[in-house]
């Protein structure tokens, strides 16, 4: 997707058990190296005008072979929370901004107690896991679900507006999280070991693969093209001058040899008549 900037993962971070021990960068797909667990991508937009609706987020994930995030259990919820915590480390420029997940309600105007049961996952998952904020879902015209991410907001009745879920109008503009099937034999993966928890596991060492690094080099190479051209021109000019001087010396040497006169006295007596 053109509006998602693909960036490389940052350096590994030190952390304790249960934390996702790596700086997570917006637009970077993160995969487990055992290729048995899902991959994820956090799509964060600093500019509010670049954020997307629920349907746009859903289509963006599907266009890359993924789905809008579904959560199977609390372990997977905690994993996503850890990734978001590393996404918002000081200095990254990432702050407030909720994230679309794939939960939504197909129906209009339900406000009864049965409303929470009408929510379903857009990828077809049968997971019944929910992590609603206090007094949510509010139903009515709010049919699509976000994961709260408001670290600078004052706590509400249910505590800080972090990681719990809230239903919102589907045309509102937010960030989003994609989920992908485990990658099989990915192209040129770069593996770096560090500690993390897999969904459903506890305190286990895992190697995570950084996917999509080669395409991201485009963002590094393109800005350097003018400099590379300048260096190439300077190098070519230098080589031309050296070659020209070398040819000048080569031409001078034979001319000098033709003007050389022997100091020996020629014997011409034999030529007298």
Swiss-Prot record:
GO molecular function per UniProt: carbohydrate binding
Parts of the chain that traverse the membrane: 217-237
Organism ancestry: Eukaryota, Metazoa, Chordata, Craniata, Vertebrata
Extra remark: A protein of the expected size has been detected by antibody binding and Western blot in at least one of the analyzed tissues or cells.
Subunit and partners: Interacts with RABGGTB.
Bilayer topology term: Single-pass type I membrane protein
GO BP term, pick one: muscle organ development
UniProt subcellular location: Cytoplasm; Membrane
Pfam families found in the cross-reference section: Lectin_C
Keyword Membrane (UniProt): yes
Keyword annotations of the record: Cytoplasm, Disulfide bond, Endoplasmic reticulum, Glycoprotein, Lectin, Membrane, Neurogenesis, Signal, Transmembrane, Transmembrane helix
Signal peptide from the UniProt entry: 1-21
Domain C-type lectin span(s) in chain numbering: 35-179
Residue ranges, compositional bias (Polar residues): 251-263
Protein name: Chondrolectin
Native source species: Homo sapiens
Cellular component GO terms held in the UniProt record: centrosome; cytoplasm; cytosol; endoplasmic reticulum membrane; perinuclear region of cytoplasm
Region (Disordered): 248-273
Record SMART domains: CLECT
Side Cytoplasmic, residues: 238-273
Post-translational modification: N-glycosylated.
Principal cellular location given in the protein's record: cytoplasm
Functional summary from the UniProt entry: May play a role in the development of the nervous system such as in neurite outgrowth and elongation. May be involved in motor axon growth and guidance.
PROSITE patterns: C_TYPE_LECTIN_2
